[in-house]
Each structure stands twice: as structure tokens, then as C-alpha cells.
């Protein structure tokens, strides 16, 4: 009697079940370091796959862009509405050295500035710094009521808007083209350019809330490690905790321990 193939009996798979591998076991953490223009140099940590064959870990980290709040970089909550973009340029040991790569405003801050009864004036300009970076800077400003003004509205005329926009562009070009990127970032943090524009346009129409709201880097020069190290300075210095003196009345008193059954 011929015995046929029983299709109901399932065959066991070869090799059995595959062992689950934790993907993080093949990755390493690197410290992200901000340029010397900022107070807090430790931005955070980033993850990358370990060097395997031709795939080098440091190459996978280069040109990564990190977005950080200026409040964290300056330890000042008043700057929470600014977002700073930092691009990874080089890897030194476990440290990722970054360079300024742009700036933007948070959406809620921009929306809070726009109000009724005033004119919004915007200008943008392309500038080149002394160290070869080409940037596009966007400026925003709002008209305000003159002193002792009774009328509720403060709308500027078209001719005044054109004059203000021209003045904005002139000041942005003058401030950016006369310094390198590091010095320009130092001007962005305290909003020095915005105050300069506000002062210069006072005779045309009084302005308020004048900000460089956005900065985009269009073109960067060829990578130079020497210049990057100048920007970072001593990046190896780690944050050390501050020693706290314990008050005399808080000193711990050792109490005798009672041994049960002795």
C-alpha cells in the first residue's frame, strides 16, 4: 500500500527562531559641543553606528544639523523664542565640534508680535562675512504710536515703508560684511542689529519689536580645522560640580545599632 504525503503535518523551519539583537548595542554616544560664542558648551548627546568595515562612525556624524533653543545655550529663559541650528563639522575623540548654521524664531513668538492697528515691515538681504560665509538675513519690524498720539492706528505710508526697508538692508549689510561669523553670532544674541535699525529709522517712523528673525547659511567656505578650533577654544574643559559646604547643624550623627538576639 502506497503511503501518500500527509499535508496536515507541518514541517519545522530550519534554524529555529532568530535571536533578537538590541540595535543600540552596535551604536555609540557622542557629546555635541557648541561654539565658544555661547555660555553653555554642552549641547547634548548624539547616537551613531560604530565603525564597521568601510563605514566610519565619524563620517556618519559630519554635517549633522542640531536645533537647540538659545535659552539652553545661554542659560537664560528670556531667549527661549530663538532656535539656533548647529552643524557638526569635525569629530575629536568623543566630542562633535559644531559651527553656527542658522537661526529662527519659534512660531508662537512670531504670532504674538503681529497685532492690529500697526504696519508690519520685512526685509531680507544676502551678505558675505569676512571669513567667506554667505548668509541670508531676514529682518522684521512693527510701527508704533508716536508720543502723545491720540489716534489708535499707526500705519506707515508706502514711501516710509520703502525708506525703512532700504535702511534695514543697509544696516544688515554693513554689520554683517564687516565681521566674521563668530563676531556676527555675538551680535545676534543680544539683538544689537535690531536696536541699531530702531535707532536709525526713528526719524522716518518710530518702530518697535525690531528683530533679525531668521538667518540662513547659503554657502560655507572650505573646511579649515584651524579656524574651527579657534571658534571652539578649549572644548575639553568639562563641567565640574560646585562644592557645597554642609552646615554644622546638618552633620549626620551616627546612632548605635541594636542587634536583636544578642
Curated annotation (Swiss-Prot):
Composition bias type Basic residues, residue spans: 1-18
Matching PROSITE patterns: RIBOSOMAL_S3AE
UniProt record, GO biological process: translation
Cellular localisation: Cytoplasm
Coiled coil start-end: none
Oligomer and partners: Component of the small ribosomal subunit. Mature ribosomes consist of a small (40S) and a large (60S) subunit. The 40S subunit contains about 33 different proteins and 1 molecule of RNA (18S). The 60S subunit contains about 49 different proteins and 3 molecules of RNA (25S, 5.8S and 5S).
HAMAP family: Ribosomal_eS1_euk
Protein name: Small ribosomal subunit protein eS1y
Organism: Arabidopsis thaliana
Protein encoded by which gene: RPS3AB
